[in-house]
Amino acid sequence: MQQTLEKIGKQVFYKRLQQKMTQEELCQGICSVSYLSKIENGKIEASEEILQLLCARLEIAVTDLRDVEEDVKGKLDEWLNALVHLDKQQVERIYEELQGEMKHVLDFEIINYYKLLYTRYLIMKRDFPAVEKELESLKKMYKKYSPFQKLLYTYSKGLYYFLQHRYKKALEYLTRTEVMAKEQGYHENGIYFNLALVYNELEVEHMTLHFANVAMEGFKNEYKFRYVINCQLLIALSYIQKKQYNEALSIYNNILREANSFADKESITAIALNNLGFLYYNLKDYAKAKDYYLQCLKYKKEEDLNYIDAVYEIA
């Protein structure tokens, strides 16, 4: 019963905001503001007459939620899974399907779930003006979110700040995301990998190594070996910063041996050779550094992203 009250209340609340109506405007001549507030917060069951009048003003019908909403909820779960695993074909397919189906959804929880995942989708597409706009809009609804929705919002903020090179803000939000994920029993390896990336930018090598290793073990368990390579690249870079050159050299040589197993072998090889050049530059062996940089250029395409963008592909 309580769940039903909350669902109806949240729908009334959401539709009111959607139509840019104040509580006073919605309830005028129908009920008091305090009574409407209790309805929106699921604290009281509105009489059928009042509910009919409120819905008429909001131009919605007082009916049970359509079955399509459960189907949409399942599809949103699939979309999240595709976004987490960066299955771009699936991401685009589900996005297209949702465009028509979301028009039939009234449920506040489902609409917010969609908007939160849509923001993650925009991050994947690197559409930063749209991401900023969505995050600002979502912020207004934060108090109404479920714990998991708050996690999704916080994670998207962290990713956005990272891609804007605001690393301290990114660390703040990604750290909060990790805490929330542990509290909720939610696991996503990308959270740990992105924490490793942020710590790398902030030059906190021991934390970079910690989170990169956590992410790497997770990816191994999921048989996502291309992402394991990303973690190894980051770990080796941290070893260079810590002047543990032999450890870094061992990792890069291993990556070069394994590169042919992957579809994007040229990209992997280019990054490894580039970073070997950086390693020998730090050792002041400039001849070897130059040799590796020149080898790297044979593989590096003009449109290739820089190192961080290349390893960041799982975000």
Features from the language model and the residues they span:
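A short, Lys/Arg-rich alpha-helix, primarily the initiator
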Residues: 1-18
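Short alpha-helical DNA-recognition segment
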Residues: 20-38
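DNA major-groove recognition helix of helix-turn-helix/homeodomain DNA-binding modules
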Residues: 47-64
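Residue register of alpha-helical TPR repeats
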Residues: 73, 113, 152, 190-192, ...
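Amphipathic alpha-helical segments of tetratricopeptide repeats
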Residues: 96-103, 135-143, 175-182, 213-224, ...
